[in-house]
Amino acid sequence: MPKLKTNRAAAKRFKFTKNNKIKRKSMNTRHILTKKGPKRRRRLRGLTLVHNSDWKSIVRLMPYGVR
């Protein structure tokens, strides 16, 4: 059976934690930041975890990411 291919777009966007949770960058942080308040921009700066309902579909894109 051939090796499974990793989706390269997903590999650039998501990282797995030690406990197999998936980290992602917050959305709404690219442009038009002037109308967003400083508190909101600070909150959007960090990484967030992917919701449980999306976990399985991302794992299918990255078969070797899960430990």
From Swiss-Prot:
GO CC terms of this entry: cytosolic large ribosomal subunit
Entry's Gene Ontology molecular function annotations: structural constituent of ribosome
The protein's name in its UniProt record: Large ribosomal subunit protein bL35
Taxonomic lineage of the native organism: Bacteria, Pseudomonadati, Spirochaetota, Spirochaetia, Leptospirales
S-adenosyl-L-methionine in keyword set: no
Sequence similarity: Belongs to the bacterial ribosomal protein bL35 family.
Entry keyword annotation includes Ion transport: no
Domain of life: Bacteria
Keyword list, A-Z: Ribonucleoprotein, Ribosomal protein
GO biological processes: translation
